[in-house]
């Protein structure tokens, strides 16, 4: 009797999941399999939807393409720099916001604005800040000149300058979401842990390392994973710049 109830419960659960599974199968699994099959077809004619043969030429061509290899290099640099930095800075800001009670909601709104701003609009702002033209060196170059440095063309100039702008832009765009998530995570930590630690005379640094970080570590892990995924898929950011 108990096994029958369990089987009925399992069947009911699978029926609830069926629409979502069908959606995933039709719109995610099938396209992935289809594209994987297409990748081995050589000499494909889109008009007649025919191909000449099957092989690994497409993979060989891509892996020997200098533009593709450069794109892979740029992507890995972007991921390695932006994900740890954006998460660490967001954690510092979220900790500060959590500690400051007055105007907390105002600061949260201000920090969240870049996340809801149009990507192209943000890209134009960065162009004005960094791009060197015949009429203006850009706002950042003006600051550099004030300190006695020379103007740098961050957009069309050296490789390091372009990567700096792209990394800075990516961190600035993704950080608001991370601040929001981490602020919520910090607010959910039970205050009794902090009160007990203060009674024992524990320092603030030790409280942060031993209580705060372990309690919000699942959210940090989530942000790191989603940050890696988002950075590997970054395309609109480059187009906007």
Which functions belong to the PLM regions below?
Residues 4-241:
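A structural signal for multi-pass alpha-helical bundles of membrane permease subunits
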């Amino acid at each position: 009797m108990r096994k029958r109830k369990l089987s009925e419960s399992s069947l009911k659960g699978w029926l609830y999941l069926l629409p979502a599974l069908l959606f995933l199968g039709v719109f995610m699994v099938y396209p992935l399999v289809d594209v994987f099959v297409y990748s081995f077809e050589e000499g494909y004619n889109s008009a007649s939807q025919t191909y000449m043969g099957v092989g690994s030429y497409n993979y060989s061509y891509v892996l020997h393409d200098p533009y593709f290899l450069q794109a892979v290099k740029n992507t890995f640099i972007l991921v390695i720099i932006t994900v740890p930095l954006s998460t660490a800075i967001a954690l510092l800001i979220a900790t500060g916001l959590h500690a400051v009670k007055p105007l907390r909601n105002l600061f949260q709104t201000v920090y969240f604005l870049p996340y809801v701003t149009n990507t192209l609009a943000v890209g134009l702002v960065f162009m004005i800040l960094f791009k060197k033209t015949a009429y203006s060196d850009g706002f950042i170059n003006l600051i550099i000149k004030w300190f006695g440095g020379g103007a740098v063309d961050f957009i069309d100039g050296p490789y390091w300058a372009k990567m700096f702008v792209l990394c800075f832009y990516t961190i600035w765009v993704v950080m608001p979401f991370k601040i929001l998530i981490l602020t919520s995570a910090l607010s959910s930590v039970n205050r009794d842990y902090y009160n007990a630690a203060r009674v024992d005379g524990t320092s603030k640094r030790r409280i942060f390392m031993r209580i705060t970080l372990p309690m919000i570590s699942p959210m940090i892990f989530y942000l790191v994973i989603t940050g890696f995924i988002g950075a590997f898929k970054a395309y609109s950011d480059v187009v906007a710049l």
